C-alpha cells in the first residue's frame, strides 16, 4: 500500500509540475498571432499527453512489479490472458505487458548478478532444457525465458570482460546451453582465449563438449552464420 501511495504522489507531482509549466506562457501568448498561438497550444497539448501517458505507464508497470506479480497474473489484470500472437500484440494494453516483462527481466538479471549466480544455475532455474523439448526451434528462440537467459549471459560476460571479474562458468553447462553461448560470444567478438577460459573443462581436448569450441571457431571465421539471440 505504501508503495502504491508513493507512486501516486510521484506521478501527481510530476503532472502538476508539467501543468504549471504549460500554463506559464499564457501572458506572453497574448501578443502572438492566432496561428502561432494555435501551433504552440497544439504542441503543448501533445507534450502533456505524451508525458501523462509515460507517467501512467511507468506507474502501472512499476506498481505491478513491486507487488510481486507474475507475467501471467499481469496478463489477467490487463485482460490479455486469452490472447496470443498477433492478437496479443495488437491489444491496446500490450505495451503495458511488454514494459512489465522487460522490467521483470531486468530485475531478475540484476539480482542474479549481485549473487554471482552461475549461468547453468540460471539455465536450470528457467527450465530451458524442458522448454526446448516442448517448443519448436523458432518458439524456443523467441521465448521470454531464453531472452532472460541470454541477457544474463551477456551482462555477466561483459562484467568479466570489462572488469576482469573471476569467471563463474561451471563445468556442468548442458550441451544446449553451450550451443547458445558460443553464438553470444561470437556475436560479441570474444577472442578464442576468452572462450577457452569461459568454457573451462568443456573446451579441453578429449571432452565431449570440445565440439562447441570448434563450432565457435567456425562462427568467428565466418564459415557459419551467427545467430543473434
From Swiss-Prot:
Induction: Expression is specifically induced early in the infection process, in contact with host tissue.
Full protein name: Secreted RxLR effector protein PITG_22926
Annotated family: Belongs to the RxLR effector family.
Function of the protein: Secreted effector that acts as a RNA silencing suppressor, probably by inhibiting the biogenesis of small RNAs in the host plant, to manipulate host immune responses and promote Phytophthora infection.
Motif RxLR-dEER: positions: 34-45
Signal peptide: 1-23
Subcellular location: Secreted; Host nucleus
Domains: entry comment: The RxLR-dEER motif acts to carry the protein into the host cell cytoplasm through binding to cell surface phosphatidylinositol-3-phosphate.
Species the sequence originates in: Phytophthora infestans (strain T30-4) (Potato late blight agent)
Annotated GO CC locations: extracellular region; host cell nucleus
Keyword annotations: Host nucleus, Secreted, Signal, Virulence
Transmembrane regions listed in the UniProt entry: none
